[in-house]
């Protein structure tokens, strides 16, 4: 928990927000960042600035790592917080539940956002409209505690430039 607090505070000081922290084999610490206004994309210069700052801060705070990687969320960004689930309402996502609902854990569908409860309360319920096995549209209602992971489905336009 200290790790997340330290990194999040440093990112806020630099004008960024934390999306995700991952630890991988070989001592890799991967930090995913975004701009709080969501308007400006993360560039290599942003990643360099954060990497430089964290490479000084982490040793001072006794947070171990061998390699530090800073990145943007990408097209298939993770959807983690209640605010993310509300922000990306109407978009297509891949959602994996911790425990199966109706004999399945994995769903792809349109995120509905907050259905009931307060946004940041543990009893907040979100929705997902997906195509069932019978081809009919179904709605899944879930809380954040039931979600293992969720990612946006990338939308890529290959039309290119018109001459």
UniProtKB/Swiss-Prot annotation:
It is found in: Cytoplasm. The keyword Metal-binding does not apply. GO terms for cellular component: cytosol. The keyword Cytoplasm applies. It comes from the Bacteria. Gene3D superfamilies: RimP-like superfamily, N-terminal. GO terms for biological process: ribosomal small subunit assembly; translation. Keywords: Cytoplasm, Ribosome biogenesis. Signal peptide: none annotated. Required for maturation of 30S ribosomal subunits. PANTHER family: RIBOSOME MATURATION FACTOR RIMP. Belongs to the RimP family. This is Ribosome maturation factor RimP.
